[in-house]
């Protein structure tokens, strides 16, 4: 493996949006880059675990670079197709595009009921969906980690610089305000502590999974979103070297909230159920 991993060191075959629109079957708009965005990785893993084949699709317009992340209208083709401009998006046959985690999970369950990733018990199911929302939903763990990074970056980057422009684009996407940036750290810590407590209760019941005795969607989302705290090592997750520092946590208070249970769980879920090394 190269010491430096580039943004474009991809292995999957990504088709253009125009090509994808003419295809049938399942297409996942992921973006052709080596960044383990937790929403995209969770979406990929749902369909991988169920053995559902899919076509990987670029985010950017034909001829545009993925590094712009939608700036200057470079996601206009995606917007025209899916009525929004972010990845991941799951499109099955001629059905409507699904751009939210819950719609993607429900689609995966419908296309391949087994292995079942949603508990049958009503109370357990409601509990699981609530916890996934705390991880992947708006104002959840991933959302607040982005707000936390945006807040730090905008305070340190020189106005007009490339870094400031990049983070300003993300700030608009995540509805950033100074007040939200200030509150993000406490929210991250709260969610991490709650998830850690959930895992400890599961261990007391003799299970290594969040709910019940088998893999659920919650295990997948927790494992994938832990990358925002501590990515898997390069040999297992060959992400762009320039992005790895931003994914690593450097805050001591958040570090304390991370504990060890969530990391151990992430490693177990990837080792036993998900694709390693991660393929971009």
List PLM regions with ranges.
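Generic alpha-helical structural signal
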Residues: 102-105, 129, 189-193, 263
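Conserved aromatic-histidine-acidic binding/catalytic patches
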Residues: 28-35, 92-96, 120, 176-187, ...
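Short His-centered aromatic/hydrophobic patch
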Residues: 225-276
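GST-like fold's C-terminal all-alpha helical module
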Residues: 130, 137-242
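GST-like domain detector, emphasizing the conserved glutathione-binding G-site
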Residues: 1-164, 273-277
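Charged, glycine/proline-rich intrinsically disordered loops and linkers
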Residues: 63-69, 160-169, 239-255
